[in-house]
Amino acid sequence: MPKEQLLMMFVSNPAGARARRRHRYAPLAAVLLLTAHPLPAAEPLAFPGAVGWAATTPGGRGGQILKVTNLDADGPGSLRAALTEEGPRIVVFEVGGVIDLDRKTIRLEQPFVTVAGQTAPSPGITLIRGGMDIAAHDVVMQHIRIRPGEAGAAKGSDWGEDAVSTASAYNVTVDHCTLTWATDENLSASGPRFTGDSPDEWRSGTSHSITFSHNIIAEGLGDSTHPKFEHSKGSLIHDNASRILIYGNLYAHNYERNPMFKGGVQGVIVNNFIYDPGQRALHYNLMALEWGDVPFQEGEMTAVGNVLRAGPSTELPLAFLMLGGHGDLLYYGRDNIAVDRIGEPLPMLGRYATGKARIIETDEPPVWWEGLEVLPANEVETWVLKNAGARPWDRDPQDIRVLADTAEGRGKIIDSEEEVGGYPQPEMTHRPFNPEDWYLETMMPKRPEVLDSRAAGRGT
């Protein structure tokens, strides 16, 4: 593929005008309405194509440029050191390769930061044997791969690691990243269930205004090192998290939580491709034992233009959205596709518990981010496979394998990274960072050749 096309994939929202034009004639009048009301021009986006309630976060805009100059787990010049600095900052990379965290989670606690993985020389940056907790506000992270894996821990031990989790964070966008081989969730939004005395205070006290866009969220490890053993999970959106947008992601080979909303969550799920879930794709569950005597809150979910396709690990029967627990869910679903391995339709709604919970279908979205452009569901599979994940212009072998298996209906849920080749071991590469090559306000490249690639034309 020419680099000019690769650059357009990177800097633009592929749904764009094409989605608006096609929805103008679509029979789904409700979907057409969802594409209206663009953001005011006065609010600059974090980067072109940014979406969701975190779309206008400044991240590290205007702050100091911090260069990652080595692949060490910590110390001067490391990624961890850059993330622990105070004040607005843009983290760029003068090295490419693997950072071995040695089971020491990175905890990002200082706000106003942009992590620009697109600046790294090929093959980009991959974190292994650990993950990242984002416990700050106004964070943009793009084009990073995180693969925790078993990290040498014993089966059923205490090694339950998310690739990325937000912890009471807000105004956070995780965009075009690859998150695989977690032993807990691959990508989650979390925090305390109840902070304060009212539902509004609960929501402000946990993660809110979070966007997960254009990521590969795949191969959560099953019978692995988590103390509960089976724990192949995609995304957990924890109780009372709100203003959550999950957009344009690939969920592949995760047993459950593709994604899962817990009690009282308010979020939007649009144009995602869910392939080969084990026993659940989307699900909602308010667990009465966790809420105790606290009044249950209705969850709110809007799901539009998503695709679910069963694979070799899928347990049938399976529904697109499954309900468990005891809390009710306000649900708006339109133009979603759910099929088995030979293209036969699967049910849209189901349940996996006998509690009193209800799915209350609504005529209008209970929650929506105005300005979101929606692609028709029958175009989503190709679009997601082309655009999701870190560095689409410079795929690494593991991403290529996941994408190819998804396209061809292959692959499975795995228990260890060793089943698919183990941790990557590329040689370290170097390239000086030149600020004149980048629009520093958005960390977009000024020219196609700025995006370093040794894989152009290799395809998937």
Language model segments and positions:
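Active-site/pore-lining binding-face segments in mid-to-C-terminal subdomains
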Residues: 266, 277-397
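Right-handed parallel beta-helix
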Residues: 100-245
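Residues in short coils/turns that link rungs of repeat/solenoid architectures in beta-rich domains
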Residues: 148, 181, 219, 252-253, ...
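C-terminal functional modules
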Residues: 341, 347-460
